[in-house]
């Protein structure tokens, strides 16, 4: 940017079309957040009506994560081939239909399947919306684009909590899911009223269709074995998270099978850059493991251990969700100022100071608890708003939606494991101690993975000839692309 351009307020760098694109995607992501968290709010009511164990009830949260990897792959490939807009609209329709089905579910199995559908739609919405907005905004504002967009999910969670307190005590838990059908109307409006992402249009103008991840995996020479592996992964995840399999050794074996399948898919689709993709999946896995025990089981903790009524639960969840939403926006500013990775590490380190007090204070002072949760979620959860920007920077435009969608949503299986892990630990400890311990310890793993830029570093160790030295979204250098101790002069930009 020139000096004169730097003196202009950041929001003046955006034209009306870019703001409209952002607003539409943000509302879509708000509705995604609204639909997705409904099950966490009514988990105790559903558990009571269906007669479920704690682990079975937690598996209803996990179910949406089981299908996310395939939704991210399929809808991401749609975004790479046909445009980000169509993928975003299709995703909204998919998770809305799943939410409506939850309201009609007669029992555990039906609701579990409906949650699988929600997971696919949610995965597609994440990848398509994030790439859509990031590719529509100027390069120097793309951390803000990412952070502002992801704040919509937290706002949706806040809205859902407030609606829960008004609807469920009067009409019951099923009525909450019937409201979730409204996003379909919004999706139909989106299809006609928003432009396509600029980066995608420029990349595809006058060119033949790209070879997407779906083409590589399911239309290539290994398509039969890949289809079989897809069914094997789906079956393995079902047995792991449906709540019926109690043998830890079998669960571990099935988990290892899934890991091998996902790594195989990454190697086939990414070629020589597979180490980067595998490490990104690991980053996201631990990001979910540290954050989702709190996200998923906080309502249960408030209702059971602190004995809060629905109105008080809604108020506390407002502080939590609003803090995460504010944190996404703050993270966007920090990312554009400090750089994506440095902002991420600094925010997580600050959040560690607050995680123990949140669960040590008890339920005697609701307002102090709410304030602590606000700042802890602002720093610990909100910074994940720039995670799409961080991941997307490792992929070229013509593979970004599927690359981001698949990588993120395979790692998001940590979100499926997290509430079950929290519930299992809570059988030996109280739930608050279990949640605090998981979050505090696993956050440090994420700090190391991102702070040391392990995706670039492992790529340099294993396949240096395919190393990307600069971020594909904002052109900033990757710190892990050069050995520790090397100066800035060691960076030589590689061709995509």
From Swiss-Prot:
Pfam family, one: MFS_1
Main location: membrane
GO CC terms: plasma membrane
Keywords annotated in UniProt: Cell inner membrane, Cell membrane, Membrane, Sugar transport, Transmembrane, Transmembrane helix, Transport
Top-level division of the source organism's lineage: Bacteria
CDD domains: MFS_SV2_like (cd17316)
Catalytic activity: N-acetylneuraminate(in) + H(+)(in) = N-acetylneuraminate(out) + H(+)(out)
Bilayer-spanning residue ranges: 22-42, 58-78, 86-106, 116-136, 148-168, 170-190, 224-244, 247-267, 278-298, 313-333, 353-373, 374-394, 406-426, 431-451
Keyword Chaperone: no
Membrane topology according to the record: Multi-pass membrane protein
Location(s), subcellular: Cell inner membrane
GO MF annotations in UniProt: carboxylic acid transmembrane transporter activity; sialic acid:proton symporter activity
Similarity section: Belongs to the major facilitator superfamily. Sialate:H(+) symporter (SHS) (TC 2.A.1.12) family.
Job of this protein: Catalyzes the proton-dependent transport of sialic acid.
NCBIfam families xrefs: 2A0112, PRK03893.1
Protein name, per record: Sialic acid transporter NanT
Species in which this protein is naturally found: Salmonella agona (strain SL483)
Chain's gene name: nanT
């Amino acid at each position: 940017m020139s000096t004169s351009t730097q003196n202009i307020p950041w929001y003046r760098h955006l034209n009306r079309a870019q703001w409209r694109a952002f607003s539409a995607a943000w509302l879509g992501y708000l509705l995604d957040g609204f639909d997705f968290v409904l099950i966490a709010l009514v988990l105790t009511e559903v558990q009571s009506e269906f007669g479920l164990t704690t682990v079975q009830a937690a598996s209803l949260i996990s179910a949406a994560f089981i299908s996310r990897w395939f939704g991210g792959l399929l809808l991401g490939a749609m975004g790479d081939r046909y445009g980000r807009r169509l993928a975003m609209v299709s995703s909204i329709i998919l998770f809305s239909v799943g939410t409506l089905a939850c309201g009609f579910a007669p029992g555990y199995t039906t609701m579990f399947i409906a949650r699988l559908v929600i997971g696919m739609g949610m995965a597609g919405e994440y990848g398509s919306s994030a790439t859509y907005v990031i590719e529509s905004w100027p390069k120097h504002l793309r951390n803000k684009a990412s952070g502002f967009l992801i704040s919509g999910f937290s706002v949706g969670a806040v809205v859902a909590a407030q609606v829960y307190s008004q609807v469920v005590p009067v009409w019951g838990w099923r009525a909450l899911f019937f409201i979730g059908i409204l996003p379909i109307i919004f999706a139909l409006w989106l299809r006609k009223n928003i432009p396509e992402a600029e980066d995608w249009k420029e990349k595809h103008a006058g060119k033949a269709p790209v070879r997407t991840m779906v083409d590589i995996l399911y239309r290539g020479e290994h398509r039969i074995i890949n289809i079989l592996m897809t069914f094997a992964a789906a079956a393995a995840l079902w047995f792991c998270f449906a709540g019926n399999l109690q043998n830890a050794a079998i669960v571990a074996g099935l988990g290892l099978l899934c890991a091998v399948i996902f790594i195989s898919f990454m190697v086939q689709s990414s070629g020589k850059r597979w180490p980067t993709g595998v490490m990104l999946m690991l980053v996201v896995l631990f990001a979910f493991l540290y954050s989702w025990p709190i996200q998923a089981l906080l309502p249960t903790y408030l209702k059971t251990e602190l004995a809060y009524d629905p109105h008080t639960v809604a108020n506390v969840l407002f502080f939590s969700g609003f803090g995460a939403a504010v944190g996404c926006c703050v993270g966007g500013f920090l990312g554009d100022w400090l750089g994506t990775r440095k902002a991420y590490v600094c925010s997580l380190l600050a959040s560690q100071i607050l995680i123990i007090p949140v669960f040590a204070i008890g339920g005697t002072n609701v307002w102090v608890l709410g304030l602590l949760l606000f700042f802890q979620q602002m720093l610990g959860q909100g910074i994940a708003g720039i995670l799409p920007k961080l991941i997307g920077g490792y992929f070229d435009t013509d593979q970004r939606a599927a690359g981001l969608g698949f990588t993120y949503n395979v790692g998001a299986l940590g979100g499926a494991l997290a509430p079950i892990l929290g519930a299992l630990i809570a059988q030996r400890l109280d739930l608050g101690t279990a949640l605090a311990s998981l979050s505090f310890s696993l956050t440090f793993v994420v700090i190391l993975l991102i702070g040391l830029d392990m995706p670039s570093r492992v790529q340099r160790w294993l396949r240096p000839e395919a190393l990307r030295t600069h971020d594909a979204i904002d052109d900033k250098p990757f710190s892990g692309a050069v050995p520790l101790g090397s100066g800035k002069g060691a960076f030589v930009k590689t061709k995509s």
